[in-house]
Amino acid sequence: MQQAKAIARYVRISPRKVRQVVDLIRGKNVSDALAILQFTPKGATEPVTKVLNSAVANAEHNYDMDTDALIVKEIYVDEGPTLKRIKPRAMGRADQIRKRTSHITVVVVEKKEG
């Protein structure tokens, strides 16, 4: 069974927030997944849609798969490096702000007939 893969790395959204979106489309048909993403009011839908479209394009171009028969076999989010920033506080103190990044991986496969 052939599978096509796409990875978006260093996406500047917290992995926790991206996982909320990713969990909605795991195991779904690609067209259904894109429709779900279109109507989900979360900021993470934009990079997830982009990487899903990239996986579909990879399937079509590299493996000659039928784009209408593709399903999202795997989709997961890993934590990337954290950017550390400082927020000044009262009396000369400082708090650390952690700007988290995500790596989004999508694997699509062609659904078998029957």
UniProtKB/Swiss-Prot annotation:
Family, similarity comment: Belongs to the universal ribosomal protein uL22 family.
Membrane-spanning residues: none
Keywords attached to this entry: Ribonucleoprotein, Ribosomal protein, RNA-binding, rRNA-binding
GO molecular function, one term: structural constituent of ribosome
Name assigned to this protein: Large ribosomal subunit protein uL22
Gene3D superfamilies: Ribosomal protein L22/L17
PROSITE patterns with a match to the protein in the record: RIBOSOMAL_L22
Gene: rplV
NCBIfam families on file: rplV_bact
Lineage, uppermost ranks: Bacteria, Bacillati, Bacillota, Clostridia, Eubacteriales
Single GO cellular component term: cytosolic large ribosomal subunit
Alphabetical list of Pfam families matching this protein: Ribosomal_L22 (PF00237)
InterPro entries: Ribosomal_uL22, Ribosomal_uL22_bac/chlpt-type, Ribosomal_uL22_bac/org-type, Ribosomal_uL22_CS, Ribosomal_uL22_sf
Subunit note: Part of the 50S ribosomal subunit.
GO biological process, any: translation
Function: This protein binds specifically to 23S rRNA; its binding is stimulated by other ribosomal proteins, e.g. L4, L17, and L20. It is important during the early stages of 50S assembly. It makes multiple contacts with different domains of the 23S rRNA in the assembled 50S subunit and ribosome. The globular domain of the protein is located near the polypeptide exit tunnel on the outside of the subunit, while an extended beta-hairpin is found that lines the wall of the exit tunnel in the center of the 70S ribosome.
CDD domains with a match to the protein in the record: Ribosomal_L22
